[in-house]
Amino acid sequence: VEIRCGTNGLILINELPVERYLCKVVPSEMPPSYELEALKVQAVCARSYAYRQMTSYGYPEYEAHIDDSTAYQVYGNPKPQERSTQAVNATCGEVVMYHGQIATTYYYSTSCGETTSLEAWGTPANDENGYLQAVEVSGKVGDYEKDLPWYRWEAAIPVQTLSTLVEQNLGKGLGMIRDIQVTKKGPVVLQIKLIGENGDATVDTENKIRAALGGNGYEIKKQDGGVVPSSKLLPSAFFTVEKGADIFLIKGGGYGHGIGMSQNGANEMAEIVEFFFRGAKVQMGTG
């Protein structure tokens, strides 16, 4: 462990073996109570993602590849979890490969019944990312996650609240928002047009769209009746918008960016890697 002085405080730089790193990442990213096969796949995906990030420095000024947040993978400090460690040990060295290269195995919490492709982030499909396709997360009995709280959700946002948030999030004085138009759709919403009394604004890609409509000040109701306060990002970009007299009703599904593996979907099924990452295979890595 190395400690350096940063602009806003101390920076702790932790260098450790990948397998030890994973013993903290897996329980931070997926509940240890999940099916062992799902935990194993989480370990393989987290390992693959880590090796891909090791090809360059995410923080070159500190010679660090990643940080411990959701910007990369959550590396928390939970107490040792036997089942998570078992999953890491059982898959030791295994990674997801595509066309001879370690795949960038993105994952997220919950799907709405389908995933999306890298188009959601403005990246066109090519020979290197062909494993990140939009797939239906369903079987003979329907969508695997249909009974989970975040499978469907909705938010009734007062026009005044949304108008204030949009101004804060975009830094543009559009005034009162009169309409939200979905102008491009993937499976996820890829572009929206915000029409205000003082002007319009177009927002592209799922993360920027979720950020534009996110923020504190309203509530999100999950399909099980649970209500949670809004946060800096809309739960997902799988949504529709309805305009009422004084509210915008956003009806959505899933939680997270929607690219790659749905963690809750993985917990509900068997052949996981080949399902979410089309054309990819689990193999022993070279790292």
What are these regions (language model features)?
Residues V1-G287:
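Conserved, single-site charged/polar hotspot
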